[in-house]
Design a protein with these regions (language model features):
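"…together with the soluble PPM/PP2C metallo-phosphatase catalytic core" -> "…together
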Residues: 1-69, 144-150
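C-terminal catalytic subdomain
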Residues: 54-76, 80-153
Length: 153
């Protein structure tokens, strides 16, 4: 994602299962959607050991999104979005935003929540909901790398 303050917009490219939420007035007003070939199978651009490409079909989503003052942009890896429901992210952003905390504090708190949830075995998470939809019995979080960036426009 690239934020252009002169044009009041954000340009995004999305492939795979990382994601972006645009939160305005305590609501998600825009978001990316995971690009997957099936459950737990995100689209990837990669090379084999011999240098030949695997699935290089250009299927990325390209978007240009208008921004307003006070918008909160949350960019996260699947470690965030597999372990924390969107409503929880919005709630945390609202609580932290109302408390005048920095973007870094917001990102740190979201990473901490995702990490705690990833270790739980008795929790309903976005990951466990998707697993069930795919016909798999799974409960709890999904241990994974967790990366979060937050920008207040």
């Amino acid at each position: 994602a690239v934020v252009d303050r002169r044009q009041n917009c954000m340009e995004t490219v999305n492939i795979g299962d990382s994601g972006i939420l645009l939160i305005r007035d305590d609501q998600v007003v825009w978001q990316t959607h995971p690009k997957q070939t099936g459950f737990n199978a995100p689209l990837q651009l990669s090379l084999q050991m011999d240098g030949s490409a695997i699935d290089v079909t250009p299927r990325a989503d390209l978007c240009n999104v208008e921004l307003c003052k006070g918008d909160v942009i949350v960019v996260g890896s699947d470690g965030l979005f597999d372990n924390v429901f969107q409503e929880e992210i919005v709630g945390m952003v609202k609580t932290i935003h109302d408390g005048n905390r920095s973007e870094q504090h917001m990102a740190d708190d979201l990473v901490s929540l995702a990490y705690r949830n990833s270790l739980q075995s008795d929790l309903t998470t976005p990951w466990s909901v998707e697993a069930e939809r795919a016909g798999r019995s799974y409960r709890g979080g999904k241990p994974d790398d967790i990366t979060v960036l937050v920008c207040i426009y």
